[in-house]
Amino acid sequence: MFKNVGIFLKKNNQGLQNDALNNMVISLAKCNVNIFIDESSSYHHDLVSVVTHQQFVKEVDIIIVFGGDGTLLNSARQYLEYEIPILGVNMGNVGFLTDIKVDNFDKAIVGILKGNFKIEERNLVSAKFNKNHLYGLNEVVIHSGAYAQLMRYRLYVNNKVVYEQRSDGLIVSTPTGSTAYALSAGGPIIHPSLDVWTILPMLPQSISSRPFIISSDANIEMEIFEGPNDYAKICVDGQDDIDIPYGEKISILKMAKTLKLVHPKDNDFFEACREKLGWSLNISNN
């Protein structure tokens, strides 16, 4: 099914230009596919055609990302509008999204190129305020912009007031993001097939404040009244903070587009949780 394969690497990461990566490119070429890479990449190989960004998105049927989850997030931001399926090969650390292992690449890629794969569509979250429009795969984080200092805000869902409170900030996480920053902040793990968001206060002043789950079709709004600095901050998927003036209302919604992730047919989310989070199959090992 896939005859024209694009590859994507973390920019300026010379550490990925190693024997393992070169061997995977050679294995890919043996599958009788055309291999392309965007000219903005620093990686070069005789078996890979270097093309412009416009040629890249026009030619490729699938993008294979070599790296960790952060690299896959970067590729999603660059190519989301073209709706090209993405396959992740884990050359990073945890790697919930990059589920192909380097030592299993040859077997996995042959199966996928023969049609033994499934495509999973992951929801994306958008945040709008003033003239800004941000989007991400993992989460929207709105915070005070100062370490261990609170801001006061009011939260709305579908035009109804949920609460007004003080906290370091608020995380709105997708199921994909539930195994990322939101997990570190005490949020629940959400199966990626569920169409929900997690709303998670960051170090709230009220001890009764807890994370809660809502439909991803809900309209979430947040109005910030005051904080320790001249502005509050918003950050999406760990990108650079953007200033939010006090009194501004931020609208958080599900995007119409989805990210299409390619997995082997035997991909198992719970196996990934066991492996990445150290869960045990034997209670005596816990």
Where are each of the predicted segments found?
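Gly/Ser-rich helix-loop-strand patches that form or flank binding pockets
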Residues: 79-89, 96
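Short glycine/serine/threonine-rich phosphate/pyrophosphate-binding segments
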Residues: 17, 71-75, 179-184
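Short glycine-rich anion-binding loops that position phosphate/pyrophosphate groups of nucleotides
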Residues: 69-71, 94, 176-178
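ATP/nucleoside-binding phosphotransfer catalytic cores, i.e., glycine-rich phosphate-binding loops
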Residues: 134, 142, 147, 158-161, ...
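Redox-cofactor binding/interface segments in oxidoreductases and associated redox assembly factors
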Residues: 7, 65, 172
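Catalytic core of DAGKc-family lipid kinases
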Residues: 16, 94-168
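ATP/NTP phosphate-donor binding region
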Residues: 1-62, 102-118, 129-134
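Gly/Ser/Thr-rich active-site loops/lids in small-molecule metabolic enzymes
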Residues: 164-167, 172-208
